[in-house]
């Protein structure tokens, strides 16, 4: 049956491959058996669906199986790294690289986050003469997280005071409320 279905497709493209599970991967394998027509895109750093049985080890196994695009032979599957980031500033890219270089290893995260895996700046840098990334450790004294909430509110007020800038295309403009996002571990953190 898989062979019959596979005949309908010239190419199989899988996005967010790092969030695939064993059943999904078996389907991809059945549909592409003995062919080089499966294109998978993923980033193990973005694997967030393990609670839905996603297995990032599947992605890592494929990542380690394929040769780099430069070393792969004709007709052979290859690994193409999309490392140029066209959305983020140099400060954000540097911070991401620093964090993941420290915390990713074969034992933690499944692979080494080395020079080949690190993000590269894809757009020209515009200096804004202030830190683009700030990390804070807040000593939370109780389960209400009131101190943390107050700190975040103060930081937002500071950003909106007209003295801080963000990139807007090739220009800079003052930070607006729609430029700010707060990431939470879970909705119950609100």
Write out the residue ranges for each language-model feature:
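Short helix/loop segment immediately N-terminal to the Walker
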Residues: 1-8, 72-75, 111, 159-176
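Non-catalytic alpha-helical coupling and interface elements of nucleotide-dependent molecular machines
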Residues: 14, 33-36, 64-71, 97-105, ...
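Short glycine-/polar-rich loops that comprise or flank the Walker A/P-loop
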Residues: 34-37, 43-45, 69, 73-79, ...
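Short, well-ordered loop/turn elements at secondary-structure boundaries
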Residues: 7-8, 22, 34-35, 76, ...
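Well-ordered alpha-helical segments embedded in enzymatic catalytic cores
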Residues: 23-27, 58, 147-158, 189
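Conserved RecA-like ASCE P-loop NTPase motor core of nucleic-acid helicases/translocases
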Residues: 15, 41, 80-84, 152, ...
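Helicase-core coupling region on the C-terminal RecA-like lobe
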Residues: 81-161, 167, 172
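Conserved helicase NTPase motor core
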Residues: 1-62, 81-91
């Amino acid at each position: 049956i898989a062979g019959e279905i596979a005949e309908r497709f010239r190419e199989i493209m899988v996005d967010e491959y790092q969030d695939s599970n064993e059943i999904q991967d078996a389907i991809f394998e059945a549909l592409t058996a003995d062919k080089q027509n499966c294109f998978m895109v993923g980033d193990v750093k973005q694997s967030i669906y393990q609670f839905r049985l996603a297995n990032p080890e599947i992605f890592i196994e494929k990542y380690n199986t394929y040769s780099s695009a430069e070393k792969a032979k004709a007709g052979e599957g290859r690994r193409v790294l999309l490392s140029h980031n066209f959305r983020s500033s140099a400060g954000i890219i540097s911070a991401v690289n620093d964090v993941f270089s420290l915390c990713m290893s074969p034992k933690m995260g499944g692979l080494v986050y080395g020079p080949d895996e690190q993000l590269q700046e894809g757009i020209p840098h515009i200096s804004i003469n202030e830190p683009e990334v700030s990390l804070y450790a807040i000593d939370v004294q109780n389960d209400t997280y009131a101190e943390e909430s107050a700190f975040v509110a103060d930081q937002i007020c500071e950003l909106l005071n007209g003295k801080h800038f963000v990139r807007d295309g090739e220009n800079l403009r003052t930070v607006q409320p729609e430029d700010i996002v707060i990431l939470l571990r879970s909705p119950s953190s609100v």
